[in-house]
Amino acid sequence: MAGPELLLDSNIRLWVVLPIVIITFFVGMIRHYVSILLQSDKKLTQEQVSDSQVLIRSRVLRENGKYIPKQSFLTRKYYFNNPEDGFFKKTKRKVVPPSPMTDPTMLTDMMKGNVTNVLPMILIGGWINMTFSGFVTTKVPFPLTLRFKPMLQQGIELLTLDASWVSSASWYFLNVFGLRSIYSLILGQDNAADQSRMMQEQMTGAAMAMPADTNKAFKTEWEALELTDHQWALDDVEEELMAKDLHFEGMFKKELQTSIF
């Protein structure tokens, strides 16, 4: 038999639930713009820019090579894929994996990430836990087992309380992870306000992702270009153009009116 249902004071909604939602939302907005101010542009070397342009040229050749004559296509393909001295065959780049302990730029980016992500969560979470501690804020609309009590009822030590009720501290963390769609709607998909995404990147190491291996990119592009054959798309363009009724007769029958001043 279920126990009596709890009735929450309406002031809890006004002075606890809504303030936590508003504070969490604006902290995320501030974090987004602070991250924009603190982010540093990654400097590219001349070699990296040149390699990226070569890959773009090869991809354009694969996609639009059908609009140039076959000899021109084969000449460009020979430049890239010649087995002896083709660009993708002879060019070998030295890939040096960066070390965060020796690269001051990576250390600076890590510190900026901690300042904009970890520090606000600790400060705001501690302040909310101290200010709004002990409140039962809301209830999830489905029953839960007792295993969810430590996650949803932080700061409330009531063994007889149903696990579906949410404490104020847990309500803050639910907002941290639940406002992702709101941030994407207002700030766009790639925003710095999504604290849960930033936490996942730091835990998985995506924030310090290794740069792409240029040699592997060259090999992949070489294989793709090697499988590309020339299919002349303008083979019968003259016949198709002459077969179309372009209605030129009306253009030469119009009299041009001139005025003499």
Swiss-Prot record:
It is found in: Endoplasmic reticulum membrane. Residues 39-114, 188-261 are cytoplasmic. One of its GO terms (cellular component) is endoplasmic reticulum membrane. GO terms for biological process: protein insertion into ER membrane by stop-transfer membrane-anchor sequence; tail-anchored membrane protein insertion into ER membrane. The keyword Membrane applies. InterPro entries: EMC3, EMC3/TMCO1. It holds the Pfam family EMC3_TMCO1. It is a multi-pass membrane protein. Part of the endoplasmic reticulum membrane protein complex (EMC) that enables the energy-independent insertion into endoplasmic reticulum membranes of newly synthesized membrane proteins. Preferentially accommodates proteins with transmembrane domains that are weakly hydrophobic or contain destabilizing features such as charged and aromatic residues. Involved in the cotranslational insertion of multi-pass membrane proteins in which stop-transfer membrane-anchor sequences become ER membrane spanning helices. Belongs to the EMC3 family. This is ER membrane protein complex subunit 3.
